[in-house]
């Protein structure tokens, strides 16, 4: 699990940097009532983040040993970790939407929604799912690992719904 968490953190840093870097641009233009630039900046952010998330997802699915070899050379551990990483990172394709929308909520002065969405993903969904899902699948370990992509998918759907409702209000 430590390797998986490390890979998740290591791989998410560029995406977080990208989304946090776009925040002041979106915020400045929102404050200046330049809504067209807000929308253009968000679209550029979303496209850039989607490209990175897609690349990350492809690497995790096709060549996960690239990440795992950084942390271990033990063949048995690497084999098990490859299986687990593919499950754990299955929804990494969706990270672009989650993080781009969360940071844009902050840029638009709606930090409370952003905090709620961050808590939704890791606290309100992931922790209960880690305890619940193992009871509903034949392999309880699989249930623990699949909790991450299930929580991510639900959180992204919620984030997208809330964001696009807010986005329509921009005009």
Map each language-model feature to its residues:
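Small-residue-enriched core segments of transmembrane alpha-helices in multipass membrane transport
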Residues: 6-9, 86, 119-128
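Small-residue-rich hydrophobic transmembrane alpha-helices
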Residues: 1-64, 95-114
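Short alpha-helical transmembrane segments in multi-pass integral membrane proteins
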Residues: 26-91, 134-171
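Short runs within selected transmembrane alpha-helices of multi-pass transporters and secretion channels
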Residues: 16-20, 88-107, 113-122, 144-160
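Residue-level signal for functionally critical sites in structured catalytic/ligand-binding pockets
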Residues: 1, 6-10, 73-74, 106, ...
């Amino acid at each position: 699990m430590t390797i998986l968490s490390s890979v998740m953190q290591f791989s998410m840093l560029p995406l977080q940097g990208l989304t946090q870097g776009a925040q002041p641009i979106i915020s400045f233009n929102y404050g200046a009532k330049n809504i067209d630039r807000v929308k253009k900046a968000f679209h550029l952010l979303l496209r850039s983040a989607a490209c990175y998330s897609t690349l990350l997802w492809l690497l995790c699915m096709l060549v996960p040993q690239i990440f795992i070899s950084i942390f271990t050379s033990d063949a048995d551990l690497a084999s098990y970790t490859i299986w687990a990483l593919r499950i754990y990172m299955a929804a990494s394709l969706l990270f672009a939407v989650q993080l781009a929308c969360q940071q844009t909520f902050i840029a638009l002065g709606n930090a409370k929604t952003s905090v709620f969405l961050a808590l939704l993903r890791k606290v309100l969904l992931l922790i209960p799912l880690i305890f619940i899902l193992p009871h509903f699948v034949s392999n309880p370990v699989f249930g623990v690992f699949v909790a991450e992509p299930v929580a991510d998918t639900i959180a992204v759907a919620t984030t997208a719904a809330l964001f696009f409702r807010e986005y329509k209000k921009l005009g």
